[in-house]
Design a protein with these regions (language model features):
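Charged C-terminal helix
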Residues: 235-273
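Short, small-residue alpha-helix embedded
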Residues: 147, 211-234, 238
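A non-catalytic, amphipathic alpha-helix used as a structural packing/dimerization or gating element
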Residues: 58-61, 130, 170, 236-244
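Conserved phosphate/ATP/ADP-binding segment of small-molecule kinases
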Residues: 118-201, 235
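Short pre-catalytic strand/loop immediately N-terminal to key active-site residues, enriched for Gly-Thr
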Residues: 13, 201-214
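Conserved N-terminal subdomain of the carbohydrate kinase-like
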Residues: 2-106, 110-118, 267-271
């Protein structure tokens, strides 16, 4: 039977990110993606101006009506949350549909490049820390892993490879989830992802591409979720997600695409088959 995953995050009309990224990725992997939009944006927040509709009041209806319809899920995946209120509504949804058999993957979006996003304050980060602690799998970038663990970003940035590796291993060891992927930092001409799987630690590398584009974390998390829900080992799911993103990043660089538009992943969905 086809696996079914609920994805709780926003959807943007422009910018290949969030639900606009998760829907095609999970679908091509043979997983039914059931979108639960937390907000609707005209364009993702990296643009100079945007308008949005907060869907937080609707999340309670998703929860109650899906329960009424007898919905069961094989996985729940969460991404960008705009407020503590959205986190609380997502928590209620998860409480309603979480079982011992299904997978909860949390992408704890809070910042990047050593800086917390301006829209988030200490209260939100504390709430996200508690929210992510309940997950089976989390996919923070290095900045977010530092926020979750209270680690100074300087303990990682600019340090020697051995120091970075030990910092990553230590952060994974103090975080509650059994499986953790710390995503997408650069080391020389390589891009790296660190994976923690029930205390087993490994770093996977692929060639780096110049530039930075929005939505790559969303694409990675969706591909990872699809593999794990289908019962794949963490290593295989991480490697497939990296193999999928690499040519899309190369195309974005070759075409000179602006970072706010995301990467042209559509032609590379076949890498997920």
């Amino acid at each position: 039977m086809m696996k079914r995953v609920a994805v709780l995050q926003d959807i943007s009309g422009l910018g290949r990110c969030s639900l606009a990224a998760a829907l095609p990725v999970l679908s091509v992997m043979g997983v039914q993606c059931c979108p639960v939009p937390t907000a609707v944006y005209t364009n993702q927040t990296g643009f100079s101006r945007f308008a949005f509709l907060d869907c937080e009041p609707l999340l309670g209806d998703f929860t109650s009506l899906w329960q009424e319809h007898g919905v069961t899920l094989d996985g729940i995946c969460t991404g960008f949350m705009a407020s503590v209120e959205q986190l609380e509504a997502a928590r209620a949804f998860i409480d309603a549909f979480r079982t011992h058999e299904n997978l909860l993957l949390v992408d704890p979006v809070m910042g990047d490049d050593g800086t917390r996003y301006p829209c988030f304050d200490d209260e939100f980060c504390d709430a996200m820390r508690a929210f992510a602690a309940r997950a089976d799998v989390i996919t923070p970038n290095v900045t977010e892993a530092c926020i979750l663990t209270g680690t100074p970003y300087e303990a990682f940035a600019g340090q020697a490879e051995a120091v970075q590796r030990e910092t990553l291993r230590r952060m994974c060891g103090v975080l509650p989830p059994e499986r953790i992927v710390i995503t997408g930092w650069r080391r020389g001409n390589r891009v790296c992802n660190a994976a923690w799987d029930r205390s087993a630690f490994a770093i996977y590398e692929s060639p780096a591409v110049g530039g930075s584009w929005s939505g790559t974390g969303d694409l990675f998390a969706a591909a990872l979720c699809g593999g794990l829900v289908k019962g794949e080992p963490l290593e295989i799911s991480v490697r497939r997600a990296m193999r999928f993103l690499e040519p899309a990043l190369r195309d974005a660089a070759r075409l000179g695409l602006p970072g706010v538009g995301g990467v042209p992943f559509e032609m590379h969905l076949k890498e997920l088959l």
